[in-house]
Structure formats: structure tokens, C-alpha cells
Amino acid sequence: MGLLHRRASSLGNPFRDNSTAMLVSTLFFVVPVFLLLLHCAYHTLNRGYAPWGMTHGYLQDHVLSESFLYVASYSGVVTTLNITGVRQQGGAVVVLPPVSTTEGCAGSPSWLALADRDSLLYCLDEGLKDGKNGSLASFRANRDGSLTPLDKVSTVFGPVSASSYGDRGHSLVVAHYGGSALSTWDVRDPAKISPIQVQEFELAKPGPNPSRQEAPHPHAAVVDPSGRFVLVPDLGADLIRVYLVDHAGPGLIELGPLAVAAGSGPRHIAFAVKHKTFMYVVTELGNTIVGYEVAYGQDSIAFEEIWKSGVHGKDKDVPEGAAASEVVVSPDMRFLILSSRNENTLEVPNFDPSNTTSIVSDPLVNFEIDAETGHLNLHQEVPCGGGFPRQFTINKAGTLVVVALQSDGRVVVMERDVKTGLLGKFVAYAEVEGGVTAVVFNE
């Protein structure tokens, strides 16, 4: 009472007047309610989910006390690994413990994508076991790291990449490498996935590399930073196919494609946004990294080439038989990292301390991005921890890089210095049965 009394005596007692008391009481009630409604409206409109986890019941209290990795492999299994506190353990490289496994993605999982505040996981099955169809499966990502199957639908053969797009991320676009197609899906209710569009592509004649370019081979489906366009690198057709997200519905409107060098085989795309927007394309057959400055119109997007080099930088040789694969831009947009497969030029100590045999490794190539020009400056080359780094990812803080090593059946975790952008030592790993195809963080 002392503190309250002192404040009342110093300010005067407003509650002696009934009208003033009513006004103050009303404000005490109305203001918190107004702020709560404003908070809910903001998140509902801008984040694509209802407050308090009311979207289909999949988002309720989705707050993770631990961090996980989801790993897909051609064994037909998606494995959850616990990565909590890896950087704090120090000392020897940590073996990541498996939390759970699921075979709900079918025989040959090729891609994983998180959605809806990381509460949903989509998995693509490439369909390599029967060679007829692929599939798209949805899972609820539980707080303990386990995955609960929600739905699975048959797709065109050979899906290898997917991204959420459109209003609240309620649509999914899928690139089908083996099926020469692009498909879109309504995932407003991830337990009832339904098709929107399927577009199949054809080639008039094989490309300069006929063994790999006998047909169109869309290898990725990437949403641009504005959320208005979808870019699809087609390895077989030497094109970046361009689509506008339809304002009137969930479909995509095809625009004119961006042609790349004949025989180069574009594989994956990454964007960097600072003062300008830059798009970087890694080509698998040409083993190049090509940069473009991006310009936007009302319903159009244009590209001006501003950079081209081999995957090891300007005037650097690429080993014969190499195959560039993944490209990722750091969360702060300052660095670009790419992986190259089948080089076999580096070595790392064996992760098993009882085994003295070194492990042959492919590289990760680290570039610094010039924010004004978009040019790339070679920053670092490091071993990635094994062979055939098909895919890798960076955590949200930019402190860890996780690499999926397809030929070694291994996932490795590397430290990364956010300030310098340098990749550091290995801090964790896990042996995973089958060819590892994809890995994603859930933090």
C-alpha cells in the first residue's frame, strides 16, 4: 500500500471522480483486448496461420525445446536426428543419436521441405523402386522429433524438389526430373492434398550432352524473394523456366524462359538480396556458377548476367567427371557456398576414432558476395566430410552447415563463423543407411 499511496498522493487521486474512474477502467479493459486482436490479425494475415495453433490442429503449441535434423535416403527411410547443443559439447566429434524413423515417404525419398512454421514436413518419393510414379507425403512434425503421417498422393514420376508458394504458402510446386514435368498442389489441408496443375515438357531434339539431355529434366522449383515468381532450372533443356504466381488463384502462369549456355545443365538456384537482388544458378554439366541481377516489373521479372565462373572461381580448373550440385546463400546474404561431387581430391580423418584410414572427400566452395556488383570472390575451399555432397543446408543462425553425403551414407555437421563466413571443424555426424539425398533443420 505504501507505494500505491505515494503515487496517488503525488499524482492526485483520479478515482474520486466517477467519470474519470469509468474512463480509466474502460481503458484497462479495452487496450489489452485491442492489442491482442491486433496481434492475432497480424499473424493470421502475414504468417499464414491462425493464432493459438488452430489451423487444422497441426500448429498447436509447436515450440521445440530441442533441435532436430530430418534426413532422407534412398533406403526408403526418413530419420530424425537430435542436434541439440552440438556446438556446446566441444572435444571429439559427436555422434548424432537417432530419435525416430519413418517409411511413410515410400521407397526412394529424394527431397524434404518444412512448412507452416516448421510444423509440417513434406517428403517427395522419386519412384525409383517401380519406375512408374512418384509420391508426395505430408507429416506432422512433433515436438519430440517424431513424424506423424497425414497424407500421401501419387505424382508424376521423378519428383526431386518442392517449394511452398502463394497465399499463406497453401500451394506446393514440385519439379519432376524423371517425368519431365512440373506439378502444383493444394495443401491448405495437408491431410487432404489435392492436385492443381500438371505441365509436361518436351524437347524437339536432344541437347549437346545427349546422354543427360535426351529430355527435359526440371531439377528444382524455387520461389523468388518477392514470392511472386517460381523459377525452375531444367537440366535437360538448358532453360530456367519462369512462372508468375496467379493473383486470382493457386495456379502458375508460364512466362518466357531464361536460356543458359547450351550443354551447361542448370541444376539449382539461390538468391541474395541486399541493395539489389541477385540470382545464382549452379550448372551440373558445365560446372559453372552464373550470376544475374534481377529486375522486377508489375507482373514480370528480368535477368541480366553479371557473373560467370567455374565452380572453383575464375580461371580455376574443375576436375574431370565433377558434377556441381547444391548452392546456398548464407542467412546474412554475404556468402555463397556450393558443393561439387565426384572430385575426390581431398581427405579428412576418419570419424571413427578407432579407424586410421582417411576418408576421401569432395569440396564445399565458399564465396563472398559483393553486395553492389553481385560478383563472387573465392573465400575458402574445404572438404565436406565425404563423397557426393548431393545437398546441404545452413541453420537459421548461420552457425552450422549440415551436408548430405549420398555415396557415403553419412550426414556431417560443420561449424561456421558468422562474422567471417569461414567454415570450420566437424562437430557431429551420423551414419545413415542408403544414399543420403536430403537434410533439413527443425530448430
Give residue spans per PLM region:
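Short, low-complexity, Lys/Arg-enriched N-terminal segments of secretory-pathway carbohydrate enzymes
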Residues: 1-23
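Asp-box/WD-like beta-propeller blade repeats and closely related beta-sheet repeat scaffolds
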Residues: 146-220
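Short loop/turn segments immediately following beta-strands, especially the blade-tip
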Residues: 81-93, 138-145, 185-194, 243-251, ...
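Short coil/turn segments that connect the beta-strands within blades of beta-propeller domains
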Residues: 66-67, 117-119, 167-170, 226-228, ...
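Loop/turn-rich, solvent-exposed surfaces of beta-rich toroidal or solenoidal domains
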Residues: 321-405
